[in-house]
A protein has these predicted regions:
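Short amphipathic alpha-helical interaction segments
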Residues: 527-538
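Extended, highly charged
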Residues: 42-309, 313-499, 519, 523
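Short, cationic-aromatic polyanion-contact patches
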Residues: 550-559
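A short, conserved structural fragment
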Residues: 540-550
Length: 559
């Protein structure tokens, strides 16, 4: 609970004074002029105006999404819980978990919100098997980004500056036993690319270093790394803001890798206008309906400080790295803000936020490439147990010889992170481990159907590379050789279906052409097949019955 203390200045003056100091500390980052009422301890509380009624700030709010999850998708823990116990509750849990009283401050915290395909699909309002198609559809929309005032933005209902902006007071927990420190793991980063004027959005982890400092991992190639390196080369701090507590649709947008301004991308995936507001200590615009925002800058010293180790999204530890340092200048939040943590790494990799988000993102990227490489892709699945990117399954209908191999090559070209590609015929469900295993066992000959490619750019986090960046990739053609998939031996046995054409007699049915036994039962409405057996026996005895190579019955033609 916040203690109020007497202010020696007018509320407006105090508000401006509280915001000027962190702006100067941030090496000249621009501060905003704010109309606010100020409580003690550097906290600014904004009052919404009537204009806020024009925008629905709850439609894409994380809290509302979590509140509407059914019981099979969320576990609610109302009792107080120590931060040290959070990770154990989340590990291997198929549900999202909502902690109502986490840590000494008894704050609300939710974890593993995007740790299942069904929950992400629920955020998009579609069934899980329609998720990637819906994302592809929304990417074609014309988005709208609407800027709102600070007074209207729920994210500015509470503003903490100066000493009161304290990262150690947030419900941030140690996630893995050998992690270097507690990590903020669900942070969406927002920066401005000066070269293009675009807002860049991504996902970062933030290792706590103190009350107002974290490490930020930029070792992997990314737009943010390129933007930061240019800023550091000019000896300038890079303004950056992190959103913590975002709707699954926004999180999906953050992991997409498209060469576009990514604020309109967020709006496109929402299929609704995106309300944004300018931050209080920099000029970055962030979603006005977020739960928390951490404002600040990356200092220009470059990859100067140790960061890590950390349990990475592939299920192993990443080593200590040299990374930039983030300096906090303000914390803004809703009055009833819900903090968020993402599950990353561990033995239950397929249930983690990062693996599921990565998987859906990979599927969308790969589909776009497949549409160019082959005429008819049917389904794509990036297995979450491989981190959502290493093992990829593709179902397609082959139109010409070589389609399967073209698909394999397209997958490798579309994403350097894809390591193994499995291509199957339409009768195989790519989401079924059992069916994929069966296809590998019965339709694959290694000397004929294995495609190996070496010297390929790969993900450095792959432990099998032993620290390298170049590796090999494998394609598994699990399709029937072109033109042979319709033969009897390639068909999958299934219970008979009796919906064939009806005939006045068995002889009339056989006169039309070869028929399977089930077709003959349908032809005369037989419910047990006994009369069919007897009738066929009579024809056989009369020397009139023949069978073709697939076992279908037909009447022998007169010589």
């Amino acid at each position: 609970m916040l203690r109020r203390r007497q202010l020696l200045t007018t509320p407006a003056a105090a508000g401006e004074q509280a915001l000027e100091k962190p702006a100067r500390d941030a090496a000249g980052l621009q501060s905003a002029s704010l109309r606010a009422s100020v409580t003690a301890m550097g906290i600014v509380e904004r009052k919404a105006t009537a204009a806020a009624q024009a925008t629905d700030f709850d439609r894409f709010r994380l809290r509302r999404f979590v509140e509407n999850l059914p019981a099979e998708e969320i576990e609610i823990r109302r009792e107080p819980i120590a931060l040290a116990d959070i990770a154990d509750v989340l590990e291997g849990n198929a549900k999202a978990v909502w902690f109502h009283a986490a840590g000494p401050e008894r704050q609300e915290l939710v974890g593993s919100v995007t740790g299942s395909r069904s929950r992400i699909a629920r955020g998009f309002g579609v069934a899980p098997n329609a998720l990637t198609a819906e994302i592809r559809r929304r990417l074609q929309s014309k988005p709208e980004v609407t800027e709102v005032s600070s007074a209207e933005a729920p994210i500015h209902e509470v503003v903490l500056t100066g000493e009161d902006a304290d990262l150690t007071k947030l419900p941030v927990h140690l996630q893995h036993g050998e992690d270097g420190a507690p990590f903020i793991s669900a942070a969406m980063d927002f920066t401005i690319d000066p070269a293009r004027g675009w807002t860049n959005v991504g996902f970062r982890r933030m290792m706590l270093r103190g009350r107002q400092e974290t490490g930020v991992d930029l070792n992997s190639p990314s737009d943010l790394r390129a933007i930061y390196e240019a800023s550091a080369a000019a000896d300038k701090p890079l303004p950056i803001s992190f959103v913590v507590g975002a709707h699954p649709v926004d999180q999906m947008a953050a992991v997409m890798r498209l060469p576009v301004d990514e604020l309109p991308l967020l709006a496109a995936l929402r299929a609704a206008p995106l309300p944004v507001v300018k931050c209080v200590t920099n000029d970055i615009r962030v979603p006005a309906d977020a739960e928390w925002v951490l404002e600040g800058y990356l200092d220009p010293r470059g990859f100067a400080e140790s960061e890590g180790p950390y349990g990475e999204f592939l299920g192993y530890y990443g080593s200590v790295k040299r990374n930039p340092v983030f300096h906090l200048t303000a914390i803004t939040r809703r009055r009833d803000a819900l903090f968020q943590t993402s599950t990353i790494g561990g033995r239950s990799l397929g249930l983690t936020d990062t693996a599921v988000l990565n998987g859906v993102r990979t599927e969308v990227m790969i589909w776009r490439a497949l549409e160019t490489a082959v005429r008819e892709p049917l389904a794509v699945y990036a297995t979450t147990s491989s981190g959502g990117m290493f093992n990829l399954r593709v179902s397609l209908r082959q139109r010409v010889p070589g389609d399967a191999r073209n698909a394999i090559a397209a997958c490798f070209g579309a994403s350097p992170n894809v390591k193994n590609v499995f291509v199957v015929d339409p009768d195989i469900d790519v989401f079924s481990d059992a069916q994929m295993d069966w296809a590998l066992a019965t339709r694959f000959q290694p000397d004929r159907d294995l495609v190996l490619m070496s010297g390929m750019r790969s993900l450095p986090l792959d432990p099998s590379l032993n620290g390298g960046r170049i590796g090999a990739k494998a394609g598994f053609d699990l399709t029937w050789p072109f033109g042979t998939g319709n033969r009897l031996e390639a068909r999958v046995p299934a219970p008979p279906v009796y919906n064939g054409k009806r005939f006045p007699s068995l002889a009339a049915a056989l006169a039309e052409g070869p028929k399977y036994f089930a077709d003959l039962m349908s032809a005369v409405g037989s419910r047990d097949g006994r009369e069919i057996v007897l009738a066929l026996d009579e024809l056989r005895a009369a020397g009139r019955l023949e069978r073709d190579g697939d076992g279908r019955y037909f009447i022998k033609r007169d010589e």
